[in-house]
Amino acid sequence: LANLEYFVIVSYYDADISWTSKIKYPYEIYYKEKPDKQPFSAPNKAKSETNIFKFLYEFYDKLPQNIIFVHQYEYKWYHRGSLVDLLNSPDLVPFYKSSKTPGYASINCVPLGDVKPQIPKMIRSGWWKETMEPYFGNIYKYHNFTKNKGAAAQFIVSRERVRSLPREFYKNMFVWLVKNSIGD
């Protein structure tokens, strides 16, 4: 994996994923509750997020240069048109490389809103304190950090950006989600 410039992780649960055979990048399907598919299987908790965090901590030392995380749907309201067309577009890499946040770009078209109403839930659940605070400190120093960011967890991220945090961060996030999420 480490030699790949781009690698796609498709989070799969129950949809038709035949479209994946048409994407130009190497890819792997990430399953839910399929022990025979290990290491590409995660508990059915927290939707695609457990797939993302499990992949990042398990493959931390051999990550591709850039990882593209997508959901199982070729067509969905949160991305424009066909995911095949989006991933195969000659504009995808220039879009990613020109992102305001180096090493990260959302490929969704729906922006997030204000985080402020969600902060009490993040604190009450223990999520921020147990997973984020050791690395980022007090949540209130970040102001409105979600406003207009791409929603729905489909994105491209560089190995360098992932490794700006230790492997333990991703493992802790995965474990917290598995222990504290209702099956999805």
Predicted regions and their residues:
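ER/Golgi luminal nucleotide-sugar-dependent glycosyltransferases, focusing on the catalytic module
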Residues: 1-184
